[in-house]
Structure formats: structure tokens, C-alpha cells
Amino acid sequence: MSSLAAPQTGLLRQYLVLTKPRVTQLAVFCAVIGMFLAAPGMPDLSHVVFGTLGIWLLAAAAFAINCLIEQEVDARMLRTARRATARGTISDIQVLSLSGLLGGAGMLVLYHLVNPLTMWLTFATFVGYAIIYTVILKPRTPQNIVIGGLSGAMPPALGWAAVADSVPAEAWVLVLIIFIWTPPHFWALALYRNNDYIKAGLPMLPVTRGQQFTRLHILLYSFALLATTLLPYAIRMSGALYLASALALGGMFVWYAWRLYREYSDALARRLFRFSILYLALLFGALLIDHWVGLLR
């Protein structure tokens, strides 16, 4: 029995890696925040549960397709060379089947147990990431992250739609925050993984325009991000607690970007990349806490 279980466990682990669980977790977290912000009180828990499930399934399906399309590129990069698709230990048919199963299940869950709007928006996000970004933008332009960042910024709108069956201006403000956050987040990664991207032949900004140009644009985007995160307070979507959090977190982001601009090191770029993930989670957490505090007044 144990000899049979080991290969099955290994295959399941390979499938899980292809769905990029860490990235999926952050995306789904932002979607869930959108769900809770969409309701003046406690949202319909069935919509929260099934909305979360459906969005997670389609996100996982998109990431699996991404790994399939980029398997040759991944094989040339140290960071991704151990993926099953890059090593050839899992077939294209298996990945397509996995993605089709996850994506189909996600669409059924969202359509029948949440609402059609959320299903179509999530499907459009799937196409935007798996096809438009991965196939068209990423291998062709250094602005791939900027243009293609919209698909990665959509989770709050998807979550909002799951609860409210609409996507008002407040939801698009959250999308805008992630949209502005995306370039400095990925450019920091591209800086300290620059050799990987050169080997892979991908036109990331540090490859095409150089390190100094990229560092400057990370700094400029960090200021733009700080300004953008003040919008929820400006439109009275949030209160003083969120404002203080946005200023503190944004100030730290600018500080990291300024240090990276003044004196580059791979360690600083890696530190900014990791902080940017924590930054987004804390910022959206502050939005939710501020929302709940407002409900108690």
C-alpha cells in the first residue's frame, strides 16, 4: 500500500505546485476582503464560501495553464526549473485536464451558487492572465507587467461582485491599488533574478532597459502607490485607522524603494519583493479592520 501511495502523493504535490498556492492565497485573500467590504454588515456567508471556492478554483486553473505554456521558459530559469512541467515529469494532457477540471468546477460553482456576473468576471480574468498576459504580453514587451497587471489586480472586484452582484467605484479603487502595486513588486523580483530572465529570453524591464532605469521606476511607482492608497479615505470608503495604516505602510514601501534606488544589491531587491507581499496583505487587512470598526460606531 505504501509503495502505491508514494507516487500518488508525489503526483498530487506536483499538481499543487502548478497551481502556485502562495500566489493564489494572496489573490483569494484580497477577493475575500472585497466580499466583506461590499456588505454594510455581515455578508451572506454562502456567497463568501462559494465565491472564495470558485475564485480559487479558476485562479488555480489559470496558474496551471501558465505553467504549461511557459514550460520551456521555466526549464531555463533557476527559480522555476523544478516545476513538473519544466522537468517533463507530467504530461501536457495531465495539466490541461487539471486546468479544465478546476476551471470548469469554478465556473459552475460561481454561476449556480454565487451569480453569473462573478463567473464572467472571473473567467475574463482567467483569459487575461493565462492567454493575454502569458502568451501575448510577457514574451513580447517590457511593459508586460504594467499592461497585464489588470488581470492580477481583479480579485477585490471579483469578491465584491460575489456579494453585491455589482462592481461599484469602491471596488475599482481596490483594483487600482493592486494594479499600481504590481509593477514595483515584480520589478524587484526581476532585478535580483535578472540572469534568469536573460537566459529565458523574456524582455523584463531590467533586461531591456537596465538596472538603474528599473530602480528609478520602482521608486516612482512607490510614490504613485502611496498616493493611490489614500483614495479609500478620500472617497470616505474608510476612516482614520486605514489612513494611518496606509501612510505607515506606504512610507515603508517608499523607504525600501529609495534605498534600492540609492545603492543596489540583490539582498535589498529581495527584501523589497518580500516586503511588498506583506505590505499588500497588511493594507487590505487594515481596510477590513477599519470597515468593521466603522460598523461598531
From Swiss-Prot:
It is found in: Cell inner membrane. GO terms for cellular component: plasma membrane. Pathway: Porphyrin-containing compound metabolism; heme O biosynthesis; heme O from protoheme: step 1/1. Keywords: Cell inner membrane, Cell membrane, Heme biosynthesis, Membrane, Transferase, Transmembrane, Transmembrane helix. One of its GO terms (molecular function) is protoheme IX farnesyltransferase activity. GO terms for biological process: heme O biosynthetic process. Its EC number is 2.5.1.141. Disulfide bonds: none annotated. The keyword Signal does not apply. It catalyses: heme b + (2E,6E)-farnesyl diphosphate + H2O = Fe(II)-heme o + diphosphate. The chain crosses the membrane at residues 23-43, 49-69, 93-113, 117-137, 144-164, 171-191, 215-235, 238-258, 275-295. Converts heme B (protoheme IX) to heme O by substitution of the vinyl group on carbon 2 of heme B porphyrin ring with a hydroxyethyl farnesyl side group. Belongs to the UbiA prenyltransferase family. Protoheme IX farnesyltransferase subfamily. PANTHER family: 4-HYDROXYBENZOATE SOLANESYLTRANSFERASE, PROTOHEME IX FARNESYLTRANSFERASE, MITOCHONDRIAL. Carbon 2 of the heme B porphyrin ring is defined according to the Fischer nomenclature. This is Protoheme IX farnesyltransferase. It comes from Bordetella pertussis (strain Tohama I / ATCC BAA-589 / NCTC 13251). The lineage of its organism: Bacteria, Pseudomonadati, Pseudomonadota, Betaproteobacteria, Burkholderiales.
